[in-house]
């Protein structure tokens, strides 16, 4: 049977993979956004695990709010990336430091 520790270890592994993904790939914005989404998934896993094992529904409800914010963040981030790609023909992070406003 799976215990709370199994889910917490899974969440920690997912969180660590996302941190490694951010630090190893600092050039591609899409991979950075995917790593941030994986980080939010790890947090959601911990919320659901604590909610289930403590018998409280608040953690599961909070997951829906986090998923909503993550979806909005992904949509806005991808819209910004499309705009940057159309104007600069690249999504390389090193080339995005010359923004004009």
UniProtKB/Swiss-Prot annotation:
GO molecular function terms attached to this record: NADH:ubiquinone reductase (non-electrogenic) activity; quinone binding
Pfam families associated with the record: Oxidored_q2 (PF00420)
Swiss-Prot/TrEMBL keywords: Cell inner membrane, Cell membrane, Membrane, NAD, Quinone, Translocase, Transmembrane, Transmembrane helix, Transport, Ubiquinone
Protein location: Cell inner membrane
Enzyme type, top EC level: translocase
Transmembrane segments: 4-24, 30-50, 61-81
EC number: 7.1.1.-
Gene Ontology CC entries for this record: NADH dehydrogenase complex; plasma membrane
InterPro entries with a match to the protein in the record: NADH_UbQ_OxRdtase_chain4L/K (IPR001133), NUOK/Mnh_C1-like (IPR039428)
Main location class: membrane
Membrane topology qualifier: Multi-pass membrane protein
Catalytic activity, reaction form: a quinone + NADH + 5 H(+)(in) = a quinol + NAD(+) + 4 H(+)(out)
Family according to the record: Belongs to the complex I subunit 4L family.
Assembly and interaction partners: NDH-1 is composed of 14 different subunits. Subunits NuoA, H, J, K, L, M, N constitute the membrane sector of the complex.
Function: NDH-1 shuttles electrons from NADH, via FMN and iron-sulfur (Fe-S) centers, to quinones in the respiratory chain. The immediate electron acceptor for the enzyme in this species is believed to be ubiquinone. Couples the redox reaction to proton translocation (for every two electrons transferred, four hydrogen ions are translocated across the cytoplasmic membrane), and thus conserves the redox energy in a proton gradient.
Record-linked PANTHER family: NADH DEHYDROGENASE SUBUNIT 4L-RELATED, NADH-UBIQUINONE OXIDOREDUCTASE SUBUNIT ND4L
NCBIfam families recorded: PRK05715.1-2 (NF004320), PRK05715.1-3 (NF004321), PRK05715.1-5 (NF004323)
Protein name: NADH-quinone oxidoreductase subunit K
Lineage: Bacteria, Pseudomonadati, Pseudomonadota, Betaproteobacteria, Burkholderiales
């Amino acid at each position: 049977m799976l215990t709370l520790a199994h889910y917490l270890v899974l969440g920690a592994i997912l969180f660590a993979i996302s941190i490694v993904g951010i630090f190893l790939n600092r050039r591609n914005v899409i991979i950075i956004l995917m790593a941030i989404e994986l980080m939010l998934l790890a947090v959601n896993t911990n919320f659901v695990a604590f909610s289930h094992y403590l018998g409280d529904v608040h953690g599961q409800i909070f997951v829906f709010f986090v998923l909503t914010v993550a979806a909005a963040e992904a949509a806005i981030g991808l819209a910004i990336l499309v705009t940057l790609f159309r104007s600069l023909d690249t999504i390389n992070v090193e080339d995005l430091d010359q923004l004009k406003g």
